[in-house]
Every structure is written in C-alpha cells, then in structure tokens.
Amino acid sequence: MNSIELPLLDRTAQNSVISTTLNDFSNWSRLSSLWPLLYGTSCCFIEFASLIGSRFDFDRYGLVPRSSPRQADLILTAGTVTMKMAPSLVRLYEQMPEPKYVIAMGACTITGGMFSTDSYSTVRGVDKLIPVDVYLPGCPPKPEAVIDAITKLRKKISREIYEDRIRPQRQRSNRCFTTNHKFHISRSMNTGNYDQGFLYQPASTFTSEIPTETFFKYKSSVSSHELVN
C-alpha cells in the first residue's frame, strides 16, 4: 500500500464527516422542511392551489401543508382580510411555534387591494396584524411567483441566526390599527400578551369620525355577535 495515500477506511471516514455549526444545521433543516399553514380567503389562493398539482409539485421543496398552526412554521396569507377575521389570523399566528415565517400573497393581502378604497371593514395590509417576511405582489400572482417567493424565504432562513431573530420579536412593540385605519403602537403580540378583543362601534358611528383607540382592546363584556361586521 502506498504510504502517501490514506487507507480506504480513513478516506471513507473523512468523506462521511460534516463540520458545521448548530445554527447552520438548524437553518438547513428548517429551510428544507417548511410546513405551511394555508390561510386563503379569495382568488389568490386558487393560484396557490395549482402548486399542489403535478405540474408544479411543490412537495419537492419539502412543503407539507398542515391543518394545525401548532405543527406549522410558515403561514401563507392569500386574499382579502377583513377586520372581523383579523383576530382569527393573529390567533393562528400566535399558536405557531418559533421560529415562524409569513408570506403575504397578492395585492389584497399586502395593501387591501381594490376592496380597501371604499370599505371600512378591510384590513389595509396584513403587516398591520402580523410581521411579514416575504411580500408577493400580483392580482393574482402566478404559481411561478409563489415558487420564487418560497425560494427567497429559503435563502433568508439559510442566512439568519436564531437568537437574532427571536430577540427583536420579543423586544419590539407591535403595530395595530384602528377602525379608521390609523396606526397605533401597542404591546408586542409575540410575547403572548397582546390584547385579544375587538373595540366595536355601533353602526351609527361609522358615519362620523371614530376615536383612535386601539382596535385590539380587550373587552370581556363584548360578545361574538356584537363584533363589527
């Protein structure tokens, strides 16, 4: 045996050892197995549904749709979000384990779309409710654009540090909105201490200026049938 060459056993052992960090290994495992929670309310979600078919086959990216937010690490919002649906979306996001990601798909999700021009009940941007990682514009976006958004999210995950992602979420305050679509700073919802209620107004008050109190103000006396439609 040539003394310069390594024995076959040593060469095999060297080729089988991976030198990496725990953070890089965690990022690699997460970007290769994203489990999305699909939150579709309008026509944009039909475009996403085509990804499940054999033509695009999004399973090759490791995406496994989940029906429970506690088993998902990615929520994909598609379609119009109304104020009545806002607490449900925030609740689903809060039930997802860390680290978690959000893709906003379509113009209606990002800005409210054409429905926000003369509607008091449309949320003008889902980023007023939950932090968004990737914005995917379009009306509706093509399936190829959805794949590109997922690819960009995978690249973002591969470069992040877990501690740096968790720390700002725990320290920053959250942007909430009022019933007249004005920004308001409140306690961070990522700590689980966000206010979980609706500040509702009777129908007669929508003809006048609405006070700038927080939209997510807890009122235990308000029942579900009294919420703003």
From Swiss-Prot:
Catalysed reactions, as listed in the record: a plastoquinone + NADH + (n+1) H(+)(in) = a plastoquinol + NAD(+) + n H(+)(out); a plastoquinone + NADPH + (n+1) H(+)(in) = a plastoquinol + NADP(+) + n H(+)(out)
List of residues binding [4Fe-4S] cluster: C43, C44, C108, C139
InterPro entries for the chain: NADH_UbQ_OxRdtase-like_20kDa, NADH_UQ_OxRdtase_20Kd_su
Taxonomic superkingdom: Eukaryota
Molecular function terms, GO-annotated: 4 iron, 4 sulfur cluster binding; iron ion binding; NADH dehydrogenase (ubiquinone) activity; quinone binding
Pfam families, per the entry: Oxidored_q6
GO BP terms in the entry: aerobic respiration; electron transport coupled proton transport; photosynthesis, light reaction
The entry's keywords: 4Fe-4S, Chloroplast, Iron, Iron-sulfur, Membrane, Metal-binding, NAD, NADP, Plastid, Plastoquinone, Quinone, Thylakoid, Translocase, Transport
EC identifiers of the protein: 7.1.1.-
Cofactor(s) needed for function: [4Fe-4S] cluster
Cofactor binding note: Binds 1 [4Fe-4S] cluster.
Localization in the cell: Plastid, Chloroplast thylakoid membrane
Annotated membrane topology: Peripheral membrane protein
Enzyme class: translocase
Keyword Transport: yes
GO cellular component: chloroplast thylakoid membrane; respiratory chain complex I
Keyword Disulfide bond: no
HAMAP family in UniProt: NDH1_NuoB
Function recorded in the entry: NDH shuttles electrons from NAD(P)H:plastoquinone, via FMN and iron-sulfur (Fe-S) centers, to quinones in the photosynthetic chain and possibly in a chloroplast respiratory chain. The immediate electron acceptor for the enzyme in this species is believed to be plastoquinone. Couples the redox reaction to proton translocation, and thus conserves the redox energy in a proton gradient.
Family in the record: Belongs to the complex I 20 kDa subunit family.
Assembly mode: NDH is composed of at least 16 different subunits, 5 of which are encoded in the nucleus.
Protein name: NAD(P)H-quinone oxidoreductase subunit K, chloroplastic
Organism whose genome encodes this protein: Coffea arabica
Top-level taxonomy: Eukaryota, Viridiplantae, Streptophyta, Embryophyta, Tracheophyta
